[in-house]
């Protein structure tokens, strides 16, 4: 989205975009610039190391990393940078994303990855959480997040009858 991106949204393969675009849609709605890139832990390990080692220098304050199957991307990025990493397990056809969840959530002590839910809801929440992290130092973003939440609440309150 922008060269001034403070959030990077990376994924293990192009097929993960269907899930990870949920994070970028939230960031777009909140007017938060981000960078998007495919970085495969298994197919492009050198690229992964370069991305992670340069994350802070490139201005990223939060990294959202989504992967499916043997989902090593979030953990490997976290191992190579001190920039906070939010991991999104992408639903897989074989084990419905449970394999991805376990790969991301079971990190060893000392290398944290903030793990979200499996699939699109997890990606959307990763976008929200990344924005909330940045909002601690950005009053305008904080205000936009308040409006987002208020809008969510009003959508429920304004439509209480599930039949309509």
Swiss-Prot record:
UniProt gene name: purE
PANTHER family: PHOSPHORIBOSYLAMINOIMIDAZOLE CARBOXYLASE, PHOSPHORIBOSYLAMINOIMIDAZOLE CARBOXYLASE CATALYTIC SUBUNIT
Pathway: Purine metabolism; IMP biosynthesis via de novo pathway; 5-amino-1-(5-phospho-D-ribosyl)imidazole-4-carboxylate from 5-amino-1-(5-phospho-D-ribosyl)imidazole (N5-CAIR route): step 2/2
A GO biological-process term: 'de novo' IMP biosynthetic process
GO molecular function, one term: 5-(carboxyamino)imidazole ribonucleotide mutase activity
Source organism: Haemophilus influenzae (strain ATCC 51907 / DSM 11121 / KW20 / Rd)
Catalytic activity field: 5-carboxyamino-1-(5-phospho-D-ribosyl)imidazole + H(+) = 5-amino-1-(5-phospho-D-ribosyl)imidazole-4-carboxylate
Protein name stated in the entry: N5-carboxyaminoimidazole ribonucleotide mutase
Main function: Catalyzes the conversion of N5-carboxyaminoimidazole ribonucleotide (N5-CAIR) to 4-carboxy-5-aminoimidazole ribonucleotide (CAIR).
EC numbers, comma separated: 5.4.99.18
Keywords from the named record: Isomerase, Purine biosynthesis
Positions with a binding annotation for substrate: 13, 16, 43
Coiled coil: none
Pfam families, per database record: AIRC
UniProt record similarity statement: Belongs to the AIR carboxylase family. Class I subfamily.
């Amino acid at each position: 989205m922008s060269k001034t991106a403070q959030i990077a949204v990376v994924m293990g393969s192009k097929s993960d975009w269907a899930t990870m675009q949920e994070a970028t849609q939230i960031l777009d709605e909140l007017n938060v610039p981000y960078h998007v890139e495919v970085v495969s832990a298994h197919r492009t390990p050198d690229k992964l190391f370069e991305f992670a080692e340069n994350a802070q220098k490139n201005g990223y304050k939060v990294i959202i990393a989504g992967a499916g199957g043997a989902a090593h991307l979030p953990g490997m990025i976290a191992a190579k940078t001190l920039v906070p990493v939010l991991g999104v397990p992408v639903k897989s056809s074989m084990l419905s994303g449970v394999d991805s969840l376990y790969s991301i959530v079971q990190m060893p002590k000392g290398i944290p990855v903030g793990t979200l839910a499996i699939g699109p809801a997890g990606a959307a929440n990763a976008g929200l959480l990344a924005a909330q992290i940045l909002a601690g130092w950005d009053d305008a973003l904080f205000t936009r997040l308040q409006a987002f939440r208020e809008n969510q609440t009003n959508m429920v309150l304004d439509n209480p009858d599930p039949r309509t």
